[in-house]
Amino acid sequence: MKKIMLVFITLILISLPIAQQTEAKDASAFNKENSISSMAPPASPPASPKTPIEKKHADEIDKYIQGLDYNKNNVLVYHGDAVTNVPPRKGYKDGNEYIVVEKKKKSINQNNADIQVVNAISSLTYPGALVKANSELVENQPDVLPVKRDSLTLSIDLPGMTNQDNKIVVKNATKSNVNNAVNTLVERWNEKYAQAYPNVSAKIDYDDEMAYSESQLIAKFGTAFKAVNNSLNVNFGAISEGKMQEEVISFKQIYYNVNVNEPTRPSRFFGKAVTKEQLQALGVNAENPPAYISSVAYGRQVYLKLSTNSHSTKVKAAFDAAVSGKSVSGDVELTNIIKNSSFKAVIYGGSAKDEVQIIDGNLGDLRDILKKGATFNRETPGVPIAYTTNFLKDNELAVIKNNSEYIETTSKAYTDGKINIDHSGGYVAQFNISWDEINYDPEGNEIVQHKNWSENNKSKLAHFTSSIYLPGNARNINVYAKECTGLAWEWWRTVIDDRNLPLVKNRNISIWGTTLYPKYSNSVDNPIE
């Protein structure tokens, strides 16, 4: 028996330095008063023993939260603008163009599980945070519950992390402890795995929307857009007048996600001393059900505003080409749009400096902005850029339902044109050239004015040339010419009778030949699309 005891004590003494060495190594990686366990944690932290009164409090919390009666589809809703009147169509002259502006009522309905993060609220955003699912969350100002917390398990999705190195247990899930735990996970990867994975490509999340109203863009990108637009400064006034086209792009480069293990019961997220009455006093009820931040994406967030004063219907295609880097060398119109457009970028993260970058430039430089921060390393640290929330009652995903009506404004430019007359025939000729000019009354109805050339039906001898300048709102152009044959039975003979011609930049009408064999041509230089 004594021999057995000696063997047992010897084994304990041998193993003790090893345990101390392991403990010291973990403490050097992170030392926060044992708030975080750096050992490889289980899938979820084990529940610590509770006293009878603590178990009673936990059961009451579970019963209360699980008994909250609410429709998860109606809790988080953003209602934007309601459009009742659509402004009428209008037209106006602008230099050598006639601009037609049209308005249409549109609506957008967007379900957003990811909530964007901007610097103003990043301090409130951390994995496992307990929040109220209410209008404050919809407005991206989460109302964090100030209660004692129990432990939780975090995991990170950086590549190569084995033996549960990608997990960590936070014993007291306060904001500072959780953020320190995230830093510990990232540093663990940098020290042990970064060399094997030197170029971790960011996961790309891309979304875009042509801009028409702030309410529309909030419905598209979430209420974080309000803060972003303080820097982007989308020109809604010029867009509404049809003088500008702008697109907003959200470009996320996600380096890694930190996830929280789902609690097996609501009370597992609270400290032992927390009671149902405390939660009720903090306003937790069916109108403000509790939720938790279940996942946070860390990386680089780029918001872009692309701008042009072009009225072309190909602006969206040009913007898409500029962002993707697609060559447009074979398309003159797209090339000109890109050449004469600009961008503004608001960038969060991806820099060792903890600051927001604002960059202005031409579309030709846009790809360089997007290529930066394409991979994760120490020099391109990630910041919180988006988070998701789950209801604490049942771990169901909390989705924000955004909707808004807005006025879509489109404009089209009609460039002024010209008809060039050239008469070189051996006869007397008379022309009759007419067209309609289109305008709009205050209700948006078309007003058609018929116009005639001042030299209509006047005899012209060869060689006669003239140019007729037509405004951009000219339509239904008719060109007629006749020549005098000298024949008693056919004194006038038609040379050309072309009707309902479209407006073009240069239309060349030529007549020539003899009285008996007149000829003509109708050709176009630089047609207007």
Curated annotation (Swiss-Prot):
Residue ranges annotated as motif Cholesterol binding: 515-516
Region (Disordered): 35-54
Signal peptide start-end: 1-24
Subcellular localization, as worded in the UniProt entry: Secreted; Host membrane; Host cell membrane
Subunit record text: Homooligomeric pore complex of 35 to 50 subunits; when inserted in the host membrane.
InterPro entries: Thiol_cytolys_C, Thiol_cytolys_C_sf, Thiol_cytolysin, Thiol_cytolysin_ab_sf, Thiol_cytolysin_sf
Protein topology in the membrane: Multi-pass membrane protein
Keyword Transmembrane on entry: yes
Reported regulation of activity: Activity of listeriolysin O is regulated on multiple levels. It should be high in the phagosome, thereby allowing escape of the bacteria from the phagosomal compartment. Then, once inside the host cytosol, the activity must be controlled to prevent lysis of the host plasma membrane and loss of the intracellular environment.
GO cellular component: extracellular region; host cell plasma membrane; membrane
Entry's family note: Belongs to the cholesterol-dependent cytolysin family.
Keywords: Cytolysis, Hemolysis, Host cell membrane, Host membrane, Lipid-binding, Membrane, Secreted, Signal, Toxin, Transmembrane, Transmembrane beta strand, Virulence
Short motif (Conserved undecapeptide): ranges: 483-493
KW Membrane (keyword) present: yes
Main location: secreted
Membrane-crossing residue ranges in chain numbering: 214-227, 234-243, 312-321, 329-341
SUPFAM superfamilies referenced in this protein's UniProt entry, alphabetically: Perfringolysin
Protein name: Listeriolysin O
Classification via PROSITE patterns: THIOL_CYTOLYSINS
Role played: A cholesterol-dependent toxin that causes cytolysis by forming pores in cholesterol containing host membranes. After binding to target membranes, the protein undergoes a major conformation change, leading to its insertion in the host membrane and formation of an oligomeric pore complex. Cholesterol is required for binding to host membranes, membrane insertion and pore formation; cholesterol binding is mediated by a Thr-Leu pair in the C-terminus. Acts as a major virulence factor required for the escape of bacteria from phagosomal vacuoles and entry into the host cytosol.
